[in-house]
């Protein structure tokens, strides 16, 4: 029988078993070190005292702090390693304390020339005698830090350097940055200064009031003394000048009583004429008819009407930003692109990382990585601004985990707009947290577009509220068009409205035409007076009022607000577009400005002519890059969050700016509207009233109930050409297909053309 060679094979341990074994070893070593540190901390026996003195030899009198820190690290090392800046901050603070303790030891025992020997002597004495009584300074590590520091900055300077290290370490450990602390102190100083100025003004007002009361009291006393002196004088005969006796005074005849009649006050009427302006025109005179009015006792709304701002805690974002910086650099490195993140700005809704590419890196390589960056950062979407205007950096905008709401009150307090500029409006906060405002008179018209629920209507309400906060009814007038009937109807009956909010789309085109007529009237007025714009005319009025007793009223600005342009374009596209184009071309100098809002940013609503005449645009979140290009002529709006954030592209900038719009609640709007209604009643201007329209008038635009106003022109065209087709009428009369079809039906009813015969052309019955 052959002997079988039996061999035992040892199974290799798996990776999990090795890791478990290493973990057990680490745990046992950590437990042993922890036990030794506890013996040293409580100085248990000769071993504990010896261990404590050995630690003192290294770190001096900071041994307890070192033991406590080591114990925490042994038990929580996994959590500590994840906290960026915690270890480095602790070591920086510890180094500062070592410097200060060692400097104090040198000063106390006069160890200027023998720092090392003196420090060793303090610890060795206790070590050999099993004591822990003497002060050990900063130990050997403290000596190593103290000697070069004292050589450079002296013993006193060492205290200063140690304090700086403690401060820097505290900043590294804390969740706040230097910018946050500086901003905190600057805000505190600003509040203190504001309170100081307010108290100073109050003291000045009180002093003025006291001085006024004192002057009034002195004048009253002086008047009483004068009256008393006059009463003491004897009566005098007015004809002879002789002093009358008491008997003569009693014999004077009684004075007959007369009824007092209230005088009739006649308000003067005058035309505004300037003597230096000569009228050489042979045209019909243009009457400048402004009746003088009494000063309007009107109080502007206060910020107290709006809900106070709730504090926002974005400390969590700072921790995420530090992690994202590492992820960004690692992601770019994985694609072979070398970049450095220069800085990160935390905004209300997004954080902007400013990235500097290395020399030779093409910008489009970074721009094409937006989806990969969104994947790496686990972000909803990433918007890349390449490059940042005015900087040699590329901006990467990443949504925040928590969006901080910007309240209307907060934005208004930070914007610091000029009170005399009624149309300077705060729009939102930029990524760096600064408030951004725009001047509507310079835009001069604004297009606001975005999908449903993206914040468009809230932004329009914020713009209206901003104007109402600064302007009286005689300074700014509104014409509001709201086909949805729910967005702007709350503003009905405020004194700033020219007419009630227009909710009928059929009336809207007529209302816009009334504004066009007002624009033409104003230009005729400017030509009559000899000025170029509304500012020049109002300056003339002010000059005239200062020189004449007949007071004239300056022209108010007119702001036309259309909340849903798409509805108007569906009903009367040609008339609405013509009115918008005319206003866009000429209305700026006349003081008339438009704000057009739509939730359907397509080319049939925002036509090329409208875009050409409304150069300033605001884009909220849209569904596609096509819609973004329709609004802004470039992509970007499809990357927005849809939480009130927007891309603002004013007329004077080539690239859009990302802003977080302010939130104004319905309660805030109602409070400011109710306050304004208590100040003055609505005073509508009948000249802007579009009047009543019939059911089919909107279909025929400017026509009456009897038919289309182009009927006669279409009839002449058909008889002249002896051809009748909807496409010909549509092409020759520049009307839509639906209107051309209705004209064909009217021509058939009138007997001009025959009925349709399938694919054959209609017969023309009249010659």
Curated annotation (Swiss-Prot):
InterPro entries recorded for this chain? AAA+_ATPase, FtsK/SpoIIIE/SftA, FtsK_alpha, FtsK_dom, Ftsk_gamma, P-loop_NTPase, WH-like_DNA-bd_sf, WH_DNA-bd_sf
Q: Which Pfam families match?
A: FtsK_alpha, FtsK_gamma, FtsK_SpoIIIE
Record's subcellular location: Cell membrane
**Region of interest (Disordered), ranges:** 685-705
Q: Where is the composition biased (Acidic residues)?
A: 685-702
The family database entries (SMART domains) matched by this protein are listed as: AAA (SM00382), Ftsk_gamma (SM00843)
Q: What parts of the sequence cross the membrane?
A: 28-50, 54-76, 85-107, 127-149, 156-178
Q: How does it sit in the membrane?
A: Multi-pass membrane protein
Q: How does it assemble?
A: Homohexamer. Forms a ring that surrounds DNA.
* Entry domain remark: Consists of an N-terminal domain, which is sufficient for the localization to the septal ring and is required for cell division, followed by a linker domain, and a C-terminal domain, which forms the translocation motor involved in chromosome segregation. The C-terminal domain can be further subdivided into alpha, beta and gamma subdomains. The alpha and beta subdomains form the DNA pump, and the gamma subdomain is a regulatory subdomain.
> What is this protein identified as?
DNA translocase FtsK
- Provenance organism: Streptococcus pneumoniae (strain ATCC BAA-255 / R6)
